[in-house]
Amino acid sequence: MKIDILTLFPEMFAPLESSIVGKAVEKGLLDIRYHNFRDNAEKARHVDDEPYGGGQGMLLRAQPIYDTIDKIDANNPRVILLDPAGKTFNQSYAEELAQEDELIFICGHYEGYDERIKQLVTDEISLGDFVLTGGELAAMTMVDATVRLIPNVIGKEASHQDDSFSSGLLEYPQYTRPYDFRGMTVPDVLMSGHHENIRRWRLEESLRKTYLRRPDLLEKYPLNQEESDLLAKIKEEM
């Protein structure tokens, strides 16, 4: 995969070099590049200007963004604009992006964008209903969530297939050694070696956690008969 990031602050992305993203680069699975679009700005390197019609704040000008993307060697890339008004990013969207060969992220600053920038864009994406000072943190989050899904980036395919949200449910509780830590013990079923009982326990606990913490996920999750029965049992216990 090839990722190009347009930003005024490329140094902010340094932590990615020591993360799973850096390992993907080392393995040759990812080519990631940062472009300071101020370098392509006309008018004394100014990237922003006042909005026509008046109003608060400054807007990113279209010219530096267009000229920077024109110089990127890309073949039909997915172009993502980080915008609080965009569609909310989630796990299914990360899985979708992980199937792409080329991605471009545009990180904004100031009050907003010249609307004409959006003519370049395929996706307008937000992390949620809040505003950050810039798009860099959002881009780092999305890149990390996407890159870890590229085949062979992390050790085992199943290790991310069982993640919370990948299955549509929150992940079940997990334990490691020691068995007894300060009086808190591992559930006996996990020590039993009975694979079917373990599978059913994990499913029940996954449903329980989802029901208690994110019931909205269950509204769109297609329950099978076993899951319906377990969920009914959980509700009776409440």
From Swiss-Prot:
GO terms for molecular function: tRNA (guanine(37)-N1)-methyltransferase activity. GO terms for cellular component: cytosol. Keywords: Cytoplasm, Methyltransferase, S-adenosyl-L-methionine, Transferase, tRNA processing. Its main location: cytoplasm. Its EC number is 2.1.1.228. The keyword tRNA processing applies. CDD domains: TrmD-like (cd18080). It catalyses: guanosine(37) in tRNA + S-adenosyl-L-methionine = N(1)-methylguanosine(37) in tRNA + S-adenosyl-L-homocysteine + H(+). It is an enzyme of class 2 (transferase). S-adenosyl-L-methionine binds at residues 108, 127-132. GO terms for biological process: tRNA N1-guanine methylation. Specifically methylates guanosine-37 in various tRNAs. Homodimer. Belongs to the RNA methyltransferase TrmD family. This is tRNA (guanine-N(1)-)-methyltransferase. It comes from Streptococcus uberis (strain ATCC BAA-854 / 0140J).
